[in-house]
Each structure stands twice: as C-alpha cells, then as structure tokens.
C-alpha cells in the first residue's frame, strides 16, 4: 500500500496532532519523518489535553504502531518526559513505539550551542526554540552526529564525549554569557538514554518497506509547517529540516512512487510564532480576538502566536510544492461572530500585483490585497455534521476550494476529536 502524508501548510501550529489522532484508526503505522521537540502536537479527548513533541500522535490508539523516522532528531531527556507522561495515563507505549537507528540525538551541548548562537545574533535573532535542533542538524550534515543506533555500541560514551568536547570549544568561541552545569545536564541525559534503550530500535526503511509489501497502511506525520521548510520556507526564519512532502521520502526512506494521498492542513486564518515575515498579520483588536478565542499560544514554547487573515497566496504555494490532494481546514469556529472576513488573494510587490510567493516577503516589501467574504454568527462548536453548518461558512469553504483548486474534505470546529466534520 501507499504512504499517505499529513502536512502543515502554514507556519506550523495548524492542528496536525488532532487530525492525526482522528485519522489514526484508518492506519496501521503512524510515522514522524522530520523535526524534533521544537514541534508540539496538541490532542484533546475525553476531557483531557495531551501535548506530544517527538512521539507520533497515534500513540493513544491501541491498534497502531508509532514510528520515529531517521529524519527526526531526538532529545532523550524530553523524550523521557513524554514517556513518563504516557505511563502516568497508563498508555502501554513499549508495545507500539519503534525508533529508527538512523535518527540523530540532541545532546545537552546542542541546546547550549543553540542558546549561545541565538544570543550572539543580537537584534538579528531568528526566534529559535532553543531546543538544540539547528546544531543537531548541523552535526548531521557535517557528519559528526551521534545516532540512536550508536547507543547499541560499546563505545557510545566515547563518541558522545568527543562530540560534547567539540561543542564546548564552539560555545566558548561565541563569547556570550551562557550559564550551565554540564555535569548535571549529562547526568540527566544518561538517565534518559537508559530509558530510550528500553525501546525497540529498528532499521526503519526496511521496516516500512516490509510493511508496505504486506499491505499495511501508513500515515507519515509532518511537524511544523511548509512555510518553515529549510528550502521552501521564509528563509532564514525557518526550521532546519524539510517539512514538505519531499521530506517524508528522505526522512523515512520511502520512494516517491510510494506516496499516495497528501493531506494538507491549514487554519481558517493564519498564525505564526516567533520572528519572520507575516504579510497578513493584524495588530488591532481583530488579531487580539483571534488569538484569545483561538487560544493561540505555542505548545512547545508557550509563546503568544501572531495572528492575521488567511493568506491564500502563501497557501496556494504550499499546496503546489507539496502536491496536496485533499485539504483539511482547522479552527473555523474561531471566526464565528465576524460580520466580514478578509482573505489575501494577491500581493502588491514592487509596484505590481502578483499572485505568487516571491523570493523576499520581508515586512515593507509586501502589501496584501484582500477579498472580503461574508461572515457568520453561529457557534460552530456544537455542530456535528455538514448539513448543520451555516450557509455563510459553507460559502467561505467553497470560495477557498475554488481558489486553491483542491477539495476541502474535513473541517474542524473545536479542539476535541469529536468536533470534526467530514464534507
């Protein structure tokens, strides 16, 4: 069987965790293919809220295997905290969680390097989550990294020491004030590694190949969003991995011909955490209202998200680079009560009106061109089927479908897995 993809189409925080949780019953394997603990997937069900950072969102379902792919970077300390939380909720994770031997490990010194690098940039900071993601991927591409499979070797601590010593020299080079107790951090790290070694390590590309041969259904779960992709995002305000569809192939060892459906997920408006360009950002009471009603705070950092109207220019771009076959719209309920909604359908750029994402969309270079759409008053959170949705809401969705030339097959009207409507 083919591998289906679930990809965020904006700057992350689209609601992928909830939708993976909703879709999981259709799949035998849920696989994460990139990113690390800089991502946060929030799931709500049975009156409880759960946040996952590295573990795939299918872990709460009994019949699915959850795979952490080679493209993921793992912080054993944060991973252990996730496992401890699952154990507290009596989730039997050991029987349904497998980890690629080729996944790279985030060391304590990676996090310190991240902090030192960000501090050295002054006003040019890019808004790093300070989780050590960038330095870990740098070691990966620089062929210096420590991988999960190395933990099975007798000399893994020697390999760790050599890399950590190199990092300490680099931290000193930045000449910034970063306070830390490395011995204490390493003690915590080694304890977490012991927990990690209790799990099943696999050669994930072979595992997935055999799964496909035997007819298993697989969903590849992306982290963050397409506009944060290292190549196709709003560089340099991006993450350190490929968050787009192609990243699933390299992050899991899956051939392009094996890709099936590509589900693209987006909010009915736009948000962004941290620094970087955001053409439709709102600085008025409308943006404040979106943030308050939508509870827009980062699941990983707790930072307040910037809010704005839906940007169809950027969204079309994301649909294009990912080859999206079906769209999923989240948080339609947040827009209830607005008389009029605005949607950015073009940019004014260098004196011209354009409908594509240019190389540089930094503030001042781009002016959004808006199309107005009639809003709706009804509270969507109590609605359970498509026939009950208000006319104006359906007109909004129809307008987006036409502009994006892609069907919107699912809409979310609340955080709980039950607040999901198939169209």
UniProtKB/Swiss-Prot annotation:
Subcellular location: Cytoplasm
Reaction(s) catalysed by this chain's protein: IMP + L-aspartate + GTP = N(6)-(1,2-dicarboxyethyl)-AMP + GDP + phosphate + 2 H(+)
Record family assignment: Belongs to the adenylosuccinate synthetase family.
Binding-site residues for substrate, renumbered to this chain: 299-305
InterPro entries named in the record: Adenylosuccin_syn_GTP-bd (IPR018220), Adenylosuccin_syn_Lys_AS (IPR033128), Adenylosuccinate_synth_dom1 (IPR042109), Adenylosuccinate_synth_dom2 (IPR042110), Adenylosuccinate_synth_dom3 (IPR042111), Adenylosuccinate_synthetase (IPR001114), P-loop_NTPase (IPR027417)
Catalytic center residues: 13 (proton acceptor), 41 (proton donor)
Assembly, per entry: Homodimer.
The protein, known as: Adenylosuccinate synthetase
SMART domains assigned: Adenylsucc_synt
EC number: 6.3.4.4
UniProt GO MF annotations: adenylosuccinate synthase activity; GTP binding; magnesium ion binding
Residues annotated for IMP binding in this entry: 13-16, 38-41, 129, 143, 224, 239, 303
